[in-house]
Amino acid sequence: MTTVLVTGGAGFIATHTDIELLNKGYDVISVDNYGNSSPVALERVEQITGKPVKRYDGDVRDEALMERVFAENNIDWVIHFAGLKAVGESVAKPIEYYDNNLYSTLVLLKVMKKHNVKKIIFSSSATVYGTPKELPITEETPTGGTTNPYGTSKLFQEQILRDVHVADPSWTIVLLRYFNPVGAHESGLLGEDPKGIPANLTPYVAKVAVGELKEVQVYGDDYDTPDGTGVRDYIHVVDLAKGHVAVIDHIDKEGVFVYNLGTGHGYSVLEVIKAYEKAAGHPIPYAIKPRRPGDIAACYADASKAEKELGWKAELTIDDMAASSLNWQTKNPNGFRDAE
């Protein structure tokens, strides 16, 4: 039986990945401090799959805790999701972002090395490409020139992982660069549950659609894009989750492997709002605001390498993303808090 340690295992992308792993017959162990998530999410994973998740409640930066996790379990793979993830907040709180994101990775790698566990999938991001010179973005597109500490922290973590492989080529390191994960589990039991006002577009649009917030804030309508609003490659979180399972199923050799996980198609902010209007059956009010610091005009993937090497491709559409996200929001207006 393959055992997978999922750091930040109660998070948005992680819980959807937990489900795909459990459904494939893998054992899942979660370490999470619930800084931006809820233990209820793991209960929902168990409810959906009918299988247990072994929980360790705590911080990946706690070396004694991580030592215990590795001593008590026979871990085959690690998927490292744990970290802070809001672009705007990272600009305001760079020290916290570097401390949390880099230190957690260093502690994790130190303990993995000690216990001779050398297979890791790292939850990276398209932000490592900075402002891309050309689109679509391939895995060969230069990285660097990141526009915010969140993206820079992901780039630094990628470099740390590459250096670990240089020092010891017996490691298997997979860098998955996510584009913009959205949507929710079809059951309506799991979805994105940001604490406070959502920093990401789609949970914000969903809250406006159900009348919880007044209007969508559209940051900038003067970008060099077809309708002036920012264009991103939105990918359904369930497709993204399946990408992680595809890695474990397909990669059985040492090395550093890099994959973009996106749909290959960019949608503007206004197109996303239209998809939510279609799902909700009514107009969604929005207001144009100034651009946000650290944002870029457009970003979308060429994900053909993942299809060729992992047999993976995104299958769900922007309409699926909007409908599932609204279903989650309608059934859980307060996220997981009602069940806590």
Curated annotation (Swiss-Prot):
Gene3D superfamilies linked: NAD(P)-binding Rossmann-like Domain (3.40.50.720), UDP-galactose 4-epimerase, domain 1 (3.90.25.10)
Function: Involved in the metabolism of galactose. Catalyzes the conversion of UDP-galactose (UDP-Gal) to UDP-glucose (UDP-Glc) through a mechanism involving the transient reduction of NAD. Can also epimerize UDP-GalNAc to UDP-GlcNAc. Involved in the lacto-N-biose I/galacto-N-biose (LNB/GNB) degradation pathway, which is important for host intestinal colonization by bifidobacteria.
Family: Belongs to the NAD(P)-dependent epimerase/dehydratase family.
Subunit structure: Homodimer.
Pathway info: Carbohydrate metabolism; galactose metabolism
Record's protein name: UDP-glucose 4-epimerase
Cofactor: NAD(+)
Cysteines paired by S-S bonds: none
Alphabetized Pfam families for the sequence: GDP_Man_Dehyd
Binding-site list for NAD(+): 12-13, 32-37, 59-60, 81-85, 100, 125, 150, 154, 179
Species this chain originates from: Bifidobacterium longum subsp. longum (strain ATCC 15707 / DSM 20219 / JCM 1217 / NCTC 11818 / E194b)
Gene Ontology BP term (one): carbohydrate metabolic process
Enzyme class: isomerase
GO cellular component: cytosol
Catalytic-site annotation from UniProt: Y150
Database matches in InterPro entries: NAD(P)-bd_dom, NAD(P)-bd_dom_sf, UDP_G4E
Record: residues binding substrate: S125, Y150, N180, N200, L201, Q217, V218, Y219, R232, R292, P293, G294, D295
EC number(s) reported in the record: 5.1.3.2
Gene Ontology molecular function, alphabetical: UDP-glucose 4-epimerase activity
Keyword line: Carbohydrate metabolism, Galactose metabolism, Isomerase, NAD
Record flagged with keyword Glycosyltransferase: no
Catalytic activity: UDP-alpha-D-glucose = UDP-alpha-D-galactose
